[in-house]
């Protein structure tokens, strides 16, 4: 399962669809361009030789399905804080399972999950180039090349 994601460190969100407690997330691999460019910054500063990360015809496209979803959220990666607790990398740093996370604690504390769900509840995160997707579920995700 993890081999599809571990081969690249840059992934971009293409599509997210939620229906009937199934969350489908389609992502595309970002590839570092062979062509570099100079980037101008504020106050007359610049960085030379920057290579953009792009989705190309060579990019892999992957679908990750989370069944039995109880809650999910999408956060702009610029505003996301690191998770407390332990983290198990499933697909490199891209797909992770969290234990004792602040998000899992928040969802359980502010919902009826503890009262209504008998199965163990898990917190997964997808750490993409521009988005962090947190998922609370009672089942393992599946990953497939599309």
Per-segment meaning from a language model:
Residues 1-146:
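Surface-exposed, interaction-prone regions used to assemble/regulate multi-protein complexes
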């Amino acid at each position: 399962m993890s081999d599809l994601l571990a081969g690249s460190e840059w992934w971009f969100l293409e599509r997210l669809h939620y229906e009937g407690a199934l969350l489908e997330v389609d992502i595309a691999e970002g590839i570092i361009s062979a062509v570099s460019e100079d980037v101008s910054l504020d106050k007359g500063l610049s960085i030379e030789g920057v290579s953009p990360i792009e989705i190309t015809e060579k990019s892999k496209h992957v679908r990750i399905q989370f069944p039995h979803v109880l809650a999910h959220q999408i956060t702009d990666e610029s505003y996301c804080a690191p998770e407390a607790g332990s983290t198990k990398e499933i697909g490199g740093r891209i797909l992770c399972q969290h234990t004792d996370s602040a998000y899992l604690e928040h969802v359980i504390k502010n919902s009826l999950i503890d009262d209504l769900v008998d199965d163990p509840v898990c917190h997964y995160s997808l750490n993409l180039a521009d988005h962090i997707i947190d998922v609370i579920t009672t089942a393992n995700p599946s990953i497939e090349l599309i």
